[in-house]
UniProtKB/Swiss-Prot annotation:
<comment type="function">
    <text>The globular domain of the protein is located near the polypeptide exit tunnel on the outside of the subunit, while an extended beta-hairpin is found that lines the wall of the exit tunnel in the center of the 70S ribosome.</text>
</comment>
<dbReference type="GO" id="GO:0019843">
    <property type="term" value="F:rRNA binding"/>
</dbReference>
<dbReference type="InterPro" id="IPR036394">
    <property type="entry name" value="Ribosomal_uL22_sf"/>
</dbReference>
<comment type="function">
    <text>This protein binds specifically to 23S rRNA; its binding is stimulated by other ribosomal proteins, e.g. L4, L17, and L20. It is important during the early stages of 50S assembly. It makes multiple contacts with different domains of the 23S rRNA in the assembled 50S subunit and ribosome.</text>
</comment>
<protein>
    <recommendedName>
        <fullName>Large ribosomal subunit protein uL22</fullName>
    </recommendedName>
</protein>
<dbReference type="Pfam" id="PF00237">
    <property type="entry name" value="Ribosomal_L22"/>
</dbReference>
<keyword id="KW-0699">rRNA-binding</keyword>
<dbReference type="GO" id="GO:0022625">
    <property type="term" value="C:cytosolic large ribosomal subunit"/>
</dbReference>
<dbReference type="InterPro" id="IPR047867">
    <property type="entry name" value="Ribosomal_uL22_bac/org-type"/>
</dbReference>
<keyword id="KW-0689">Ribosomal protein</keyword>
<comment type="similarity">
    <text>Belongs to the universal ribosomal protein uL22 family.</text>
</comment>
<dbReference type="GO" id="GO:0006412">
    <property type="term" value="P:translation"/>
</dbReference>
<keyword id="KW-0694">RNA-binding</keyword>
<dbReference type="InterPro" id="IPR005727">
    <property type="entry name" value="Ribosomal_uL22_bac/chlpt-type"/>
</dbReference>
<dbReference type="GO" id="GO:0003735">
    <property type="term" value="F:structural constituent of ribosome"/>
</dbReference>
<keyword id="KW-0687">Ribonucleoprotein</keyword>
<dbReference type="InterPro" id="IPR001063">
    <property type="entry name" value="Ribosomal_uL22"/>
</dbReference>
Length: 110
């Protein structure tokens, strides 16, 4: 049994989210939640909410036991980039790219 949860358009770059995702891939959900709870990265709190959603989906929809779940797959894809302009000196402007990402977490029985 495999259950997924997805967050689209998270205001976080995919590169920074992948640093956190790599830490919990393949771990049990209890260990993964502990790692995310004590991480200082912004992406850790976002990924933690997605993981908690996947766990809740497994409990509610499939009747799974939380102690038996592990993070089977987690991947981060790039989302749309928001283009913004930052005014500079002498009438010039620089482009700022505010990146987003899509986070997918799949949990399964051990």
């Amino acid at each position: 049994m495999e259950v997924a949860a997805k967050l689209s358009g998270a205001r976080l770059s995919a590169q920074k989210a992948r640093l956190v995702a790599d830490q919990i891939r393949g771990k049990g959900v209890e260990d993964a939640l502990d790692i995310l709870a004590f991480s200082t990265k912004k992406g850790a709190q976002i990924i933690k909410k997605v993981l908690e959603s996947a766990i809740a989906n497994a409990e509610h929809n499939e009747g799974a036991d939380v102690d038996e779940l592990k993070v089977k797959t987690i991947f981060v894809d790039e989302g749309v980039s928001l283009k913004r302009i930052k005014p500079r000196a002498k009438g010039r402007a620089d482009r700022i790219t505010k990146r987003t990402c899509h986070i997918t977490v799949k949990v399964a029985d051990k």
